[in-house]
Design a protein with these regions (language model features):
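Active-site-adjacent beta->alpha loops and helix N-cap segments on the catalytic face
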Residues: 1-5, 125-130, 134
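Acidic-and-aromatic substrate-binding clefts and catalytic sites of carbohydrate-active enzymes
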Residues: 22, 121-128
Length: 146
């Protein structure tokens, strides 16, 4: 895509939207991820995703494919959990781990050309606080916006 855009005198920038679950240990982070969905049954999850306006988008369909190919705990790759996509449409992945693991994952995405991140978590304020205290101080970044 970058080469195609350059052929037309344009420059593309890439961003990534995901959730973050950061805890002191990886086991704690994974346990919290599991607890988020502990009361969700498959039928309810299917209904939530089906009624979303974006349920037929290519991105959402690709996330569903990744979720189906994930291991039994929902991890499609190291520290990338697709389980959150069982409960919602759209952003269906979460970086899950210790502060250093989350930081390493974000840096790996930056190395692949991702320049902007839209990060969230559940509950929003609590996860934002954990990320701000444990990951953000170690992450090189430009101006932050709300």
């Amino acid at each position: 895509m970058t080469k195609r855009a350059a052929a037309h005198g344009r420059t593309l920038k890439f961003g990534y939207r995901c959730h973050v679950i950061v805890r002191e240990t990886e086991d704690e982070a994974r346990a919290y991820a599991s607890r988020l969905l502990s009361k969700l049954d498959a039928e309810t999850g299917d209904a939530i995703r089906a009624k979303s306006l974006d349920s037929q988008s290519v991105g959402v369909q690709r996330q569903a494919q990744l979720r189906e190919s994930a291991g039994s705990e929902g991890f499609v790759e190291e520290n990338l959990w697709t389980g959150i996509g069982r409960a919602r449409s759209g952003c269906g992945a979460a970086i899950v781990g210790t502060p250093d693991q989350v930081l390493a994952k974000l840096k790996a995405y930056q190395a692949e050309g991702i320049e902007a991140f839209i990060l969230s978590g559940y509950p929003h304020a609590a996860e934002c606080d954990l990320f701000a205290r444990h990951v953000l101080p170690k992450l090189e970044h430009g101006p932050l916006t709300l």
